[in-house]
Regions:
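Extended, charge-rich helix/loop segments that form flexible
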Residues: 17-104
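Conserved acidic, metal-coordinating active-site core of Asp-based
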Residues: 108-111
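Short beta-alpha junction loops
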Residues: 8-15, 180-181
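A generic structural signal for solvent-exposed, polar alpha-helical segments
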Residues: 13, 26-27, 31, 51, ...
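C-terminal active-site subregion of NodB/CE4 polysaccharide deacetylases
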Residues: 1-4, 19-20, 103-104, 114-117, ...
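Alpha-helical protein-protein interaction elements
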Residues: 12-13, 37, 87, 141-145, ...
Length: 222
């Protein structure tokens, strides 16, 4: 009987989303060498071992995290030599799933932008449209107001004060980041949140919940 908020990227529900982090790994893992020479990144990698593939993935991901949606599209066109993006619909909810979940009294549906951009890298108009469209689409489908929001990725590298102001303007009651800090009731549009991944162990989750991870980050700078 634990309540939960599920934050939804609406473009992924329409089977049009591109979770580039999955496609990037699928591309890298099947290559023994990768060379890039484009506007955004110029580098070569040997990718024969898992370790080498991981390094390459990390390098390219770091670059992609500094790009807008349109720039990411150009990057993948150069990387894969194809305009067609891979389909990962099986990994995500669809509209029927969201509508069914919304009926559960323990579940609250929140917005998470339309296409999961790096908001800080988008223009004001683009960021506003991304946040507003996800809210409006969910409200139209579910028949009620959407009051909660999660910033994509959510760190200070991806979210700016401008983005918080957009969320405020669109009348969200809460918004969560992936920052670690003491919650402030006067700052409900910049709430802290712990990020978890699929392979997270129970021990690692316990370390985050009891505050050890946050203590180490804030006081030991690691």
């Amino acid at each position: 009987q634990v309540p939960a908020v599920i934050y939804v990227c609406t473009k992924f529900l329409n089977e049009l989303g591109n979770p580039w982090w999955f496609e990037l790994w699928d591309f890298v893992k099947n290559k023994e060498a990768i060379s890039l020479d484009n506007t955004f990144l110029k580098k070569e990698w040997i990718t024969k071992t898992i370790f080498e593939k991981t390094i390459c993935y990390s390098d390219i991901k770091s670059c992609l995290m500094t790009l807008s949606l349109s720039e990411q599209k150009l990057f993948f066109l150069d990387l894969t030599k194809s305009e067609k993006r891979k389909n990962y619909n099986h990994l995500f909810l669809d509209w029927d799933d969201v509508i069914e979940l919304d009926k559960n009294p323990l579940i609250t549906i929140g917005a998470h932008t339309h296409a999961h951009p790096i908001l800080k890298m988008e223009s004001y108009d683009s960021a506003y449209e991304e946040i507003e469209n996800s809210k409006l689409l969910l409200e139209q489908k579910l028949g009620h107001y959407i009051e909660h929001f999660a910033y994509p990725f959510g760190s200070k590298n991806e979210v700016s004060f401008r983005d918080c102001e957009i969320v405020k303007k669109l009348n969200f009651k809460t918004a969560v980041t992936s920052l670690c800090h003491k919650p402030d009731i006067n700052c409900m549009l910049r709430l802290p949140r712990y990020g978890l991944i699929e392979t997270e162990s129970l021990d690692n989750i316990a370390v985050k919940i009891n505050g050890i991870s946050n203590f180490l980050q804030r006081h030991l700078m690691i």
